[in-house]
Amino acid sequence: MAKSPENSTLEEILGQYQRSLREHASRSIHQLTCALKEGDVTIGEDAPNLSFSTSVGNEDARTAWPELQQSHAVNQLKDLLRQQADKESEVSPSRRRKMSPLRSLEHEETNMPTMHDLVHTINDQSQYIHHLEAEVKFCKEELSGMKNKIQVVVLENEGLQQQLKSQRQEETLREQTLLDASGNMHNSWITTGEDSGVGETSKRPFSHDNADFGKAASAGEQLELEKLKLTYEEKCEIEESQLKFLRNDLAEYQRTCEDLKEQLKHKEFLLAANTCNRVGGLCLKCAQHEAVLSQTHTNVHMQTIERLVKERDDLMSALVSVRSSLADTQQREASAYEQVKQVLQISEEANFEKTKALIQCDQLRKELERQAERLEKELASQQEKRAIEKDMMKKEITKEREYMGSKMLILSQNIAQLEAQVEKVTKEKISAINQLEEIQSQLASREMDVTKVCGEMRYQLNKTNMEKDEAEKEHREFRAKTNRDLEIKDQEIEKLRIELDESKQHLEQEQQKAALAREECLRLTELLGESEHQLHLTRQEKDSIQQSFSKEAKAQALQAQQREQELTQKIQQMEAQHDKTENEQYLLLTSQNTFLTKLKEECCTLAKKLEQISQKTRSEIAQLSQEKRYTYDKLGKLQRRNEELEEQCVQHGRVHETMKQRLRQLDKHSQATAQQLVQLLSKQNQLLLERQSLSEEVDRLRTQLPSMPQSDC
């Protein structure tokens, strides 16, 4: 009765310790599952709620499972006690009738084998217990190592996911800048049909990448990106409105230029009409004077040409102002791009702070583990104290045994019954040994299973590490290649822009020259018509007045011929220049067309490359997600296996405790039987001595008997 409260307290302490360990393990496993589920790209917003509910259900099941185990163990102990009571109740009723109530109680207490038979079993039992404790420690150490490795793998996966997110953000920003630049170029120089085709081909992968990125990113990062997108769209709208305003200004300037050209043509037509009217109404002397001084009329044309040059300079200054405004808009776009970069840097700093917080959490976990170790040490010290108290109780019990040994002298007649009971106990011992051997074989098979599982996990961890290193190398190489290609393409685009600007200026100059040449041709034709008219008049006058003006007519004819030759030479020169300008314009147009085709082909190739890169990244992400799911399933299996092993360890511990109690009872009964045997032997010796003394007295009396009748006689 003195040992029952101590055993109950020990069982309670062990149960509390096991519960604390299980709670700690369940928390760590829950944290691992949460960390694995955070980097998943394909999971939506409803999935975390489901995972949370399942984790809560698992925690409830885990907390309820030890209670079920304890109730099952209690039921097993009750069944064992009932079986023992049934076995003891199978004793023959005839013997029970012969035995007194005191003898029956003492018989139940002494129903155990001798000390010599139980020494071997006790030694084997202690060795077996030590072996099981060592195996349990080894399993716990391996489990802790596996947990640490899994934490390392989880941290590495988080780092890879952050790198992928940053790369996607950079790629989206670059694509946006390229699309904006290409849109401006197409709006200014390329036709609307080609612009629409290229725009559609360039926008499709961009929208597709945005969709993939939105699916992959987490909720917080999506909100930040949406804010950035809103700000960027607002800035784009402002810049587009400015561009529209500038385009409207350009259209107005072009209209004014066309109006001025029409006014010039009208004025030139009026001037030509005035000159024709004047020539028709002149007399001979005035006509001669104007023919001699025909160069005076060219001054008017030179003035008009100078005025047109001034207007051209004004238009060029207006174009320069428009270009400066375009440069300002480009600077604004660059400032907006820098602001977006700053926002991304801020987000990266936030992620860095997040990692710091995770490191602090890990440090707190380590401190909690240290505290748990300290509490375990305190438990060990308390257990040692209780062991000392148990030894004291054992000493007191031995004293009580000695006191009760004096009462066991009455059992000298039950030696035969004790021998029969010893035989029964030996049979039970043999059955217990067989059970222990079966348990040992089961434990050996389970050890083999555990070693196999550990080997598989190590192989899988090595494989995952190798694959991770290869993925990191490929990722770095791909990133360097893409950066180089983008820099080269940016340089080429800048060169092409400069060449386009130069060709545009050259085209404008050539167009202006061609317009001037055409105007000069028209003027020369008008002058030729006038000269022919004058020649016709002079010929008519020549017939009437040949004698008076023959000399003057010859001089005028010579002057006219010289003038005609000069005009023909000028016309030929202008036609040659015009042909040259047309050829140059044709070459420029062909070069521009080839350049535009090359640009289109490069854009198509870049779009294809971007699609290939996106497909590769998606396939890599899918592979990583599959590997993560496989590791997650493997973790679940290992957790189940661990729980089963813990349950088996608990059951084995309870069985060992029952066996220890049984062995203690056997020790008590063996010591009591040994004392009884010693007492019986001493009593037998006393009886033998008394028998010898009685036999001696009988012999002495027999010797005395024959002498008694002689004396009577």
UniProtKB/Swiss-Prot annotation:
Task: Report the residues modified as Phosphoserine.
Answer: 4, 28
Which biological process, per GO, is one annotated for this protein?
A: establishment of cell polarity
Q: Which residues form a coiled coil?
A: 129-175, 223-273, 348-707
Quaternary structure note: Homodimer. Interacts with OFD1; the interaction is direct. Interacts with FAM161A. Interacts with RABEP2, ERC1 and CEP131.
List locations, semicolon-separated.
Cytoplasm, Cytoskeleton, Microtubule organizing center, Centrosome, Centriole; Cytoplasm, Cytoskeleton, Microtubule organizing center, Centrosome; Cytoplasm, Cytoskeleton, Cilium basal body; Cell junction
The name of this protein is Serologically defined colon cancer antigen 8
Q: Does the keyword Cytoplasm apply?
A: yes
Species of the source: Homo sapiens
Where is it made, tissue-wise?
Expressed in thymus, prostate, testis, ovary, small intestine, colon, mucosa, colon and renal cancer tumors.
Supply the gene name.
SDCCAG8
